[in-house]
């Protein structure tokens, strides 16, 4: 299974692509989409850059599923609203590309990748490097996106074990595997 992770941001959005075969994770690609091509106050222009960039990444790498970080509400409500719009452009591009979309919080991703939810960005970068056997540290946005893909790989494996263990979860497991529920 090929998983595309997206770490949304209005200025810089990270993406990471990971192949999963059983318990084996393989790095495919990662990078960032920068909206600096649009004027600072041109929100619609920035959102279009994100939409087009995510659409291009999805077409190039042909993932089976995508995962996006859930926006947290921070101290500045205006920043939260802007980030939410950037995230919306990313999710819309994924759905337009006919991809099922899973969502995880930063805390869930950090816990899955590092082992605890309060991990620093540098810890996420290092663990992503180790888990994917990369020669160097990925950038922070790309590392978060790769971390989201790794998180979904782990969640998918856990759901598979759960689905096999109990007959009550077989229908839910099938829905999860098809991307209709999460």
From Swiss-Prot:
Its cofactor is Mg(2+). Pfam families: RuvC (PF02075). Keywords: Cytoplasm, DNA damage, DNA recombination, DNA repair, DNA-binding, Endonuclease, Hydrolase, Magnesium, Metal-binding, Nuclease. GO terms for cellular component: cytoplasm; Holliday junction resolvase complex. Belongs to the RuvC family. HAMAP family: RuvC. This is Crossover junction endodeoxyribonuclease RuvC. It comes from Paracidovorax citrulli (strain AAC00-1) (Acidovorax citrulli). The lineage of its organism: Bacteria, Pseudomonadati, Pseudomonadota, Betaproteobacteria, Burkholderiales. The gene is ruvC.
């Amino acid at each position: 299974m090929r998983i595309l992770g997206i770490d949304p941001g209005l200025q810089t959005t990270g993406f990471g692509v990971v192949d999963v075969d059983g318990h084996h994770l393989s790095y495919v690609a990662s990078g960032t989409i920068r909206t600096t091509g649009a004027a600072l106050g041109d929100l619609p222009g920035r959102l279009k850059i994100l939409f087009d960039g995510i659409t291009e990444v999805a077409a190039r790498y042909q993932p089976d599923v995508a995962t996006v970080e859930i926006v947290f509400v921070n101290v500045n409500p205006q920043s939260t609203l802007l980030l939410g719009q950037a995230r919306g452009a990313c999710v819309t591009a994924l759905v337009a590309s006919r991809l099922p979309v899973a969502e995880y919080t930063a805390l869930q991703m950090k816990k899955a990748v590092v082992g605890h939810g309060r991990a620093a960005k540098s810890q996420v970068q290092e663990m992503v490097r180790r888990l994917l056997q990369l020669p160097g540290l990925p950038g922070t946005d790309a590392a978060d996106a790769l971390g989201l893909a790794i998180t979904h790989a782990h969640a998918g494996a856990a759901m598979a074990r759960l689905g096999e263990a109990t007959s009550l979860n077989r229908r839910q497991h099938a829905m999860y595997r098809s991307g209709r529920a999460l």
